[in-house]
A protein has these predicted regions:
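Generic recognition of short, well-ordered alpha-helical segments
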Residues: 19, 46-50, 108, 172, ...
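Short connector loops/turns at beta-strand edges and beta->alpha or beta->beta junctions
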Residues: 23, 98-100, 253-256
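Surface-exposed acidic, glycine-flexible loop patches that form ligand/cofactor-binding
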Residues: 25-29
């Protein structure tokens, strides 16, 4: 499809699962069951949520869950592992400020959210310093009124991405943002609302599953490396770590492979 593409490797990941299914059909486990989950909508954070909320999930609820993601910048086929948090939790958040429009010749007759918006733009990126662990707030979009020179703005919005390596720290950062926005709104006589999209739980690896992945990598003759710090990006696989022991690991896509989400990225077939 012109202008469309899998720029994170989901097509390759699903192909790997297909290949695994074929191998398992030829060499079935002596005991137990293996569930191959072809989950949609990973990029929006809604896919895992929909799976877990489906009543039919109880029929396949696993004792342990494993997932991989290709990682450009690492040697081809290298297994990248980490104990504890593997990838950050994150959420998209929008603050909506509502005042009152007026003629631009008489701004005093309205309530313009410009000052509150400006103060929030300055203050919010500093809030992660108040969280005990790693946290990050990235402003991504701001909007004030409309391009009408005769009108003093009556509404504004500010959108951002919040992320942290600990779920509790992420919730703390959300509360800090809400409190700051409410304080600015009250000071300037504005109504404030909050919206959330693309929310991802922290991907936390079970310590008991680490040696299993390590041993399999050794048996397959694959290089394995321990990552010192969690990745800052997020995966909705993190929700599975809240319902069963789980383990997310990376698979090197090549040191010269373009980074994920870049227009030139293409999943290396050698990983399949």
């Amino acid at each position: 499809i012109p202008g469309k593409g899998h720029l994170c490797g989901h097509d390759g990941h699903m192909t790997i699962i297909c290949g695994l299914g074929e191998k398992l059909s030829q060499n079935r486990p002596e005991s137990g069951e293996v569930v191959l989950l072809f989950q949609p909508a990973e990029e929006t954070g809604e896919g895992a949520k929909a799976i877990l909320e489906d009543p039919r999930f109880e029929e396949i609820r696993p004792d342990a869950a494993f997932a991989l993601h290709n990682l450009p910048g690492y040697p081809l086929h290298q297994v990248v592992m980490r104990k504890g948090t593997f990838a950050a939790g994150s959420t998209g958040m929008t603050i909506s400020l509502t005042g009152k429009t007026s003629h631009s010749a008489h701004p005093e007759a309205g309530i313009n959210p410009a000052q509150a918006l400006a103060k929030l733009i300055q203050k919010l990126p500093e809030l992660p310093k108040e969280v005990s662990g790693f946290a990050l707030l990235t402003l991504i979009h701001a909007e004030l009124g409309s391009l009408a020179f005769g009108t003093s703005a009556g509404k504004a919005s500010l959108s951002m991405t919040l992320r942290a390596f600990d779920q509790g720290d992420l919730e703390s950062l959300i509360d800090l943002v809400k409190n700051e926005a409410k304080a600015k709104a009250d000071k300037h006589g504005l109504k404030v609302d909050f919206g959330f999209v693309e929310s991802f739980a922290v991907s936390k690896n079970d310590l008991n599953l680490y040696p299993i992945v390590e041993e399999v990598a050794r048996e397959l003759g694959l290089s394995a490396v321990e990552k010192p710090d969690p990745f800052r990006w997020s995966e909705d696989f993190g929700l599975f770590s809240q319902i069963c022991p789980s383990f997310l690991f990376g698979l090197g896509a090549g040191q010269d492979c373009p980074q994920l989400h870049e227009g030139t990225y293409d999943f290396p077939d050698e990983l399949i």
